[in-house]
């Protein structure tokens, strides 16, 4: 196998010629899997084979041609393709067959099937491929004596630096004005952590992700970030470097904001918003200075406050300085009001705000340059507002609506909170957006205190500035319109923070939501969320992955927001927060969840490429082998089918074998199926790989992956009644498989009856009494007798009653289990008395019949008429027992098609059934579940 493994490596290399990026991943397998033989080979080869997919349709001649071609091309090491390993040869040989069977499968799905199949191959069959691979490798090495196996491992190391360089450019680009110094510093600071943490990829995601990444890295390197940002007071760099929570911690810890501008540089825009909202009018002129360095959102809040002050003084048409003075006045007024409220709630907050005022004043003094910028902004805004305050307001309101659509979602929680706080405000349409932006960050960053401050500030705003909402929106618009004109941090922040905000409001939504709840923890996650949110937009597969990954953050944010809302009630309108904030995660999760619901379903059932890779376990293999996880497209089609057929049909058609194999044993089950084919392939095998390939190509269609998936299931069942029984109980446990459940009903219910009727009826000797079953049923369970009589006609009724029995079509496969009269008696007795034995050796009573049953499976629908008697009790008992299982299981199935949920439900149901009625164990579900896979695989072998 070493040779084959080496061949794998070579083949991976040879096949990876055009796909360098994958090969670096592929190399991990040979390096990590150090020749663990079959299983490691399978997975390694799967990955490598994915690279090879294009090559693998070449055919037997293609292999040798590849050798020649690779030899020609391989003279340069990097261009040389690794010689195909045994598995790759196998895949190349059989991929077309899998394709024929599963036209909708993507290469990955086909490779998974091939890998499962390969795992099931007999060593003899594999030996042919390994020999061929050795020959291939020898020829390859002769052709390329200097060939090295891992030339590409160094490449990934190189890639991070170029990625970091663009990031420097990205940082420097927005920071052209005042950030040129901090941005390179920042880039360096982030580069260091990126190299350490491998954050290079998100750099390409855009400024927002970079911001969050910077925040995350700032957590690791806050000192460096603070040092870098403070020189220029351009605070966005530090904002980016420090997570909003960390910045918040800094601010709260160092409430003496004498360095407020620098500290606020560190403070995230959200915290700054919190400050603004808490000090809404108060921070007025003082905060503009702080805001200069603050994120664009904070600047927007600043502008909103300025607009408030200007609005207050609009009649006077105050100038920028006047607006600052007005802001200071407003600060004092608002602060007095807030101090009253703050004293009620938290004197410490009053102190903080007082410190904020002091720091704001100090900042006004310290950061006159920033003020100049702000004055420019204010002048611009003032000019705009002075020109046409009403018209501009309207325009800005419209713009706000446009621009705030994102903010709506991103800040829906805070916006709703604000709305609930400000229902009386005039420009409701605009408020949510402007206010959302201003206060949402606060709600998310300081979540508790900030939200309290927010609400207080909202209250203050209600009292002081009812006109502010319009201007918040208005200012926000003006800030957008002035982004270019307003060069101070908005430009840097706008490009990094703000421009992306438009693009990445959704990312920010999630980031903020997450940051609100989990703070620093989520701070690490938010970048992922941003990336993921973008990925969601990019593709459903990514969205499915992102949904999985991003949903936890969403839920976290939800729980966090709930916690926050729960905490906010302390002295504030926590109620608006609670519903609104809860509403925010819904909106976020809602946005994600539309896709997520579809993607989630797909993910759970099939999984996107990434999810599949992560799911590469036995379960996934079994699912793929059974055709369950063929591909996203197949999943979509399956979803459509399931929607048409109904969940039960979906489960039945798609899940029959999968469900039981899944619950029984993902890996062994799938391999079982594949082994069936491989055996036949072994029969086909010829001395030469070419002949083997040809024969296997010819023979594979016979054992096509479908057969491999579906027929193999019957074969294991044939070999093992127990396996079938266990699989069927699993199916029944999943409830949607009505036909399966009927069959399971037959066996399980017969067993079930055995146990139940032992208590219920003298049918403890039901083995003999099965012939008299109807009599007993009539006497004991007239309804069952009715079912038995009517079952031919009543099967639909049973389907109704046995909700899972919707599908008869799956029955052919599942009907295998019900045995005829004496066979059933024997099977039940053996299963009841010898659960393990049935799995091991006594499968013959059940298993031998089952061997005949694969054929009978198709006929099972007919035997059902005869078996209806048994089925009657079975159906009745199954109705009793399986309705139990189906009621729990069906909801799980209907609610989520996630394989994990179904597996858990099935497992739990099997356990419960085993507890409820060992008859289920007759099938050996619980006991055989583990054994069945092993036995099945052995039987197949």
Curated annotation (Swiss-Prot):
CDD domains: HMG-box_HBP2 (cd21989). Residues 1-18, 177-191, 499-508, 536-552, 758-771, 866-882 have a biased composition (Basic and acidic residues). It comes from Homo sapiens. The gene is BBX. This is HMG box transcription factor BBX. Residues 80-148 bind DNA. PROSITE patterns: HMG_BOX_2. The keyword Phosphoprotein applies. Residues 326-370 form a coiled coil. SMART domains: HMG. GO terms for cellular component: chromatin; nucleus. There is a cross-link at residues 385, 573, 696 (Glycyl lysine isopeptide (Lys-Gly) (interchain with G-Cter in SUMO2)). The keyword DNA-binding applies.
């Amino acid at each position: 196998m070493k040779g084959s493994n080496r061949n794998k490596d070579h083949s991976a290399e040879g096949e990876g010629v055009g796909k360098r990026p994958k090969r670096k991943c592929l190399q991990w397998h040979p390096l990590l899997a150090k020749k663990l033989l079959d299983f490691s080979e399978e997975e390694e080869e799967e990955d490598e084979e994915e690279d090879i997919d294009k090559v693998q349709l070449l055919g037997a001649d293609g292999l040798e041609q590849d050798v020649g071609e690779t030899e020609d091309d391989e003279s340069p090491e990097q261009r040389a393709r690794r010689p195909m390993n045994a598995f790759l040869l196998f895949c190349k040989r059989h991929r077309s067959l899998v394709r024929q069977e599963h036209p909708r499968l993507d290469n990955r799905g086909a490779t998974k099937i091939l890998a499962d199949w390969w795992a099931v191959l007999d060593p003899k069959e594999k030996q042919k491929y390994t020999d061929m691979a050795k020959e291939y490798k020898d020829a390859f090495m002769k052709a390329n004596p200097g060939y090295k196996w891992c030339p590409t491992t160094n490449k990934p190391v190189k890639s991070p630096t170029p990625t970091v360089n663009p990031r420097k450019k990205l940082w420097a680009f927005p920071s052209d004005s005042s950030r040129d110094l901090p941005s390179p510093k920042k880039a360096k600071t982030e580069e260091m952590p990126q190299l350490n943490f491998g954050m290079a990829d998100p750099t390409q995601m855009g400024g927002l992700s970079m911001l969050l990444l910077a925040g995350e890295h700032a957590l690791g390197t806050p000192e460096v970030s603070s040092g870098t940002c403070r020189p220029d007071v351009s605070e966005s760099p530090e904002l980016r470097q420090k997570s909003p929570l960390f910045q918040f911690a800094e601010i709260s810890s160092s409430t003496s904001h004498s360095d407020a501008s620098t500290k606020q540089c560190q403070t995230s825009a959200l915290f700054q918003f919190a400050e603004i909202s808490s000090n809404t009018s108060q921070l007025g002129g003082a905060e503009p200075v702080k805001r200069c360095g603050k994120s664009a959102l904070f600047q927007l809040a600043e502008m909103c406050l300025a607009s408030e002050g200007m609005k207050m003084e609009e009649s006077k048409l105050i100038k920028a300085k006047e607006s600052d003075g007005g802001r200071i006045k407003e600060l004092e007024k608002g602060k007095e009001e807030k101090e009253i409220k703050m004293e009620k709630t938290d004197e410490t907050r009053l102190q903080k705000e007082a410190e904020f005022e002091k720091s704001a004043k100090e900042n006004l003094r310290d950061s006159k340059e920033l003020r100049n910028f702000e004055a420019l902004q204010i002048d611009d805004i003032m000019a705009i507002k002075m020109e046409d305050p009403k018209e501009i307001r309207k325009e800005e309101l419209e713009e706000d609506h446009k621009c705030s659509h994102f903010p709506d979602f991103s800040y829906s929680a805070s916006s709703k909170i604000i709305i609930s706080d400000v229902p009386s405000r005039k420009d409701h349409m605009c408020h949510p957006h402007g206010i959302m932006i201003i206060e949402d960050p606060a709600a998310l960053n300081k979540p508790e205190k900030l939200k309290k401050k927010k609400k207080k500030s909202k209250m203050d705003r209600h009292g002081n500035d009812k006109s502010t909402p319009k201007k918040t929106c208005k200012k926000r618009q003006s800030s957008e319109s002035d982004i270019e004109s307003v060069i101070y941090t908005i430009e840097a922040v706008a490009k990094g923070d703000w421009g992306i905000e438009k693009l990445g409001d959704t990312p920010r939504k999630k980031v903020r939501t997450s940051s609100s709840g989990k703070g620093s923890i989520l701070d690490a996650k938010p970048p992922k969320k941003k990336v993921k949110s973008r990925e969601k937009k990019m593709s459903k597969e990514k969205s499915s992955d992102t949904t999985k990954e991003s949903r936890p953050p969403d839920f976290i944010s939800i729980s966090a927001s709930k916690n926050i809302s729960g905490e906010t009630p302390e002295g504030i309108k926590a109620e608006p927060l609670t519903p609104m904030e809860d509403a925010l995660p819904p909106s976020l999760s809602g946005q994600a969840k539309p896709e997520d619901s579809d993607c989630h379903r797909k993910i759970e059932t099939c999984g996107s490429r990434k999810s599949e890779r992560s799911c590469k376990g036995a379960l996934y293999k079994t699912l793929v082998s059974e055709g369950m996880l063929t591909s996203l497209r197949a999943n979509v089609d399956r979803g459509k089918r399931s929607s048409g057929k109904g969940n039960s049909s979906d489960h039945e058609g798609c899940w029959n074998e999968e469900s039981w194999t899944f619950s029984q044993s993902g890996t062994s089950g799938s391999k079982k199926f594949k082994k069936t084919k491989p055996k036949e392939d072994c029969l086909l095998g010829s001395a030469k790989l070419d002949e083997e390939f040809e024969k296997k190509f010819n023979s594979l269609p016979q054992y096509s992956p479908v057969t491999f998936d579906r027929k193999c299931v019957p074969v294991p069942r044939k070999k093992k009644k127990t396996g079938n029984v266990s699989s069927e109980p699993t199916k029944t446990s999943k409830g949607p498989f009505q036909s399966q459940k009927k069959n399971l009903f037959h066996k399980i219910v017969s067993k079930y009856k055995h146990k139940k009727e032992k208590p219920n009826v003298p049918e403890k000797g039901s083995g003999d009494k099965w012939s008299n079953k109807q009599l007993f049923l009539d006497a004991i369970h007239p309804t069952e007798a009715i079912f038995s009589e009517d079952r031919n006609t009543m099967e639909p009724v049973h389907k109704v009653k046995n909700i899972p029995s919707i599908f008869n079509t799956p029955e052919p496969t599942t009907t295998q289990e019900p045995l005829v009269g004496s066979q059933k008696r024997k099977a039940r007795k053996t299963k009841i008395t010898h659960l393990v034995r049935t799995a091991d050796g006594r499968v013959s009573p059940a298993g031998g019949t089952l061997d005949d049953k694969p054929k009978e499976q198709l006929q099972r629908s007919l035997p059902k008429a005869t078996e209806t008697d048994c089925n009657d009790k079975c159906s009745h008992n199954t109705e009793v027992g399986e309705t139990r299982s189906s009621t729990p299981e069906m909801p799980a199935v209907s609610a989520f098609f996630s394989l994990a949920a179904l597996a858990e439900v099935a497992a739990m149901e099997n356990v419960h059934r085993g507890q409820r009625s060992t008859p289920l164990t007759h099938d050996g579900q619980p006991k055989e579940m583990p054994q069945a896979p092993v036995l099945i695989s052995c039987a197949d072998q």
